[in-house]
């Protein structure tokens, strides 16, 4: 009985009595030195056919057979890979007509002279023209395959099934067409697939084989089902793109089928090579293709966004393939699933959003600059600072604003650089800063809205062109608003009263700030005058003289305010220091008094405790039983104890201790009177 395994290359057949044959390997091998007398050699379609009796082979011959067959299989695979590679190169290198004829395997046996019909095998193997869209889809299929193979369950399906290692000898009886992701990758890289549909069919076959052989609930079944769903969700996007390309590919397929039985003369074929032009080859190269680096950069830019605009969210929802696994507040999208056209649209939307963010950041963001501990007031344009003075300034965003203050603080952009260690003035500005101000509501006082560039006449930094001065804008915009310099001059008393209401530290900061930027304010107003060269020179000269006079007055007033604020601050600091010293002294006296009271209470408690102890000892001596006490002392301490010499005898124990009651003098005087008279010896017979 001979059996034939169609899965073996070379069309080998072998005898297996009773249907038993070696399934120890995926592909049997033949050894060159094996002595098989029953070997039969035939030929089918030009391929040799041999029948090998497995029952008559020894173990060494079988091993040699396996080795030989594996070697031949490897040679066939290498040949197939080279053939497919040459076909792919021939397809992509055709530039005249876009139609390339490739000789199939064994085609040299057929002749295609004039009047000869084309061999159906060679006609069927003639490839259809591959367009740019199909090539891009195949690249996306390759990316999807990489994701499948790198999945946590992909390792099970990355290699062919080893029936010997897994001990599943009946696998090829159940599964007629084995397939794995590794084989799919090899076929994809070698160009075997002519369209993405063939790729999808092999991927589905891989998972369906695993689900067919393994029962539901098995680990491999669950893994295959998970990967199948993973693939189907992402294949929907590619399938939509593929449906658009089928319109162009189907006519070429029909022409290929018609050419199977058509007589093709050689001269006509040469004419087609030189004259035929494929319209798709002209249109497709114009399409933009996004590279992998651009895709990666696009993904990083999307991840870096904290807020998404509405148009970007709508675009992502429209192109989202995972419709079932998302919520209202979450969108999951794969960059590799999107087409190049969609990716470029997404890139444009993202660039537009980033430009809007950059414009917002580059716009004027005013912030107040306050001075904690300013230096001596003076001309800011002549003051130079070192690195230590930079610590005296802080930026106040407006949280500690004075609600009723008439002071108009000058605000500067956040990117303003205030001085440096090279000796630039704190009043000067490096680069091209713009001056602006926060609109504040104050009684009868306008604010400064300056946006001119500072030139280098007063400060040490270079400047560029500037706009119209803010004071002129205020005068033209509203007649009720006046310049800050004139308002300060006219309302000196009001500002002084308001500053008195402020804390000394706040007043000092405001005065130093105004004094520091006085030159900048006046210079900003003077610059528009220098730009208006078309005006009357005499009028310009008068305005300059007025500005110089106002500048001198303003400087004098600001210096006086700064000095007054400095003096007030010093007085406040001295008063606060005196109050702090007095408070510390008072606290020290209170602590000392509390310590003395605690010491006295402690001494009194100690004396009372000692007197109570003495009284308890005396009471014990008065109430103790002398006989019992002496007996216990003799038993415990022995005869050498000093207390044994005391004989209590029933007398007062205090007298035994040497304590006696002292009698008063009155009692001593009364003793002779009460004492009995001395006895007189009376002789017998004598009458008294």
UniProtKB/Swiss-Prot annotation:
Residue numbers spanned by region Disordered: 1-36, 423-505, 660-688
Pfam families the UniProt entry points to: BET (PF17035), Bromodomain (PF00439)
Coiled coil: 534-613
Keyword annotations: Activator, Bromodomain, Coiled coil, Nucleus, Phosphoprotein, Transcription, Transcription regulation
SMART domains: BROMO
Domain NET: 280-361
Any GO CC annotation of this UniProt entry: nucleus
Subunit structure: Interacts with BT1.
Descriptive protein name: Transcription factor GTE9
Organism per entry: Arabidopsis thaliana
Lineage of the organism: Eukaryota, Viridiplantae, Streptophyta, Embryophyta, Tracheophyta
Protein's gene: GTE9
